Regions:
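Conserved, structured core segments of small domains
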Residues: 1-112
Length: 112
């Protein structure tokens, strides 16, 4: 959450520490978000989910992850003007992230 607040002030998001280590900003398609949260951010508080206009990103590449799925990776900073919406992801009583209404149809894992 703090990283995003800083990005909004500067106009540029350079990614999380994990993104910087990997050399790109990790993205997920809408239907991949629930699994990404479960796998990489279990019970993590103060998360912000960004909805981005991917058509305006020049350095976005789709690459295969270790689970075999294709994920978008941004090999540049993210200009905040390409962020269409932002959602806080509070935790429910079980420590599961509450999805915004737009993503609730994806709250179950997708078939592979």
């Amino acid at each position: 959450k703090e990283e995003w607040q800083t990005a909004k002030q500067t106009g540029i998001y350079n990614g999380s520490d994990n993104d910087k280590k990997d050399g790109y900003i990790h993205f997920s398609e809408e239907d991949q978000v629930p699994e990404t949260l479960k796998s990489h951010y279990p019970k993590k508080e103060n998360l912000i989910l960004l909805r981005v206009n991917a058509f305006k990103l020049e350095h976005l590449l789709w690459e295969q992850a270790s689970n075999g799925d294709m994920y978008p990776h941004l090999y540049s900073s993210l200009d905040v003007k390409n962020v269409v919406d932002e959602f806080e992801l509070p935790l429910d009583n079980d420590g599961i992230h509450e999805l915004p209404e737009i993503l609730k149809k994806y709250q179950f894992s997708r078939p592979r």
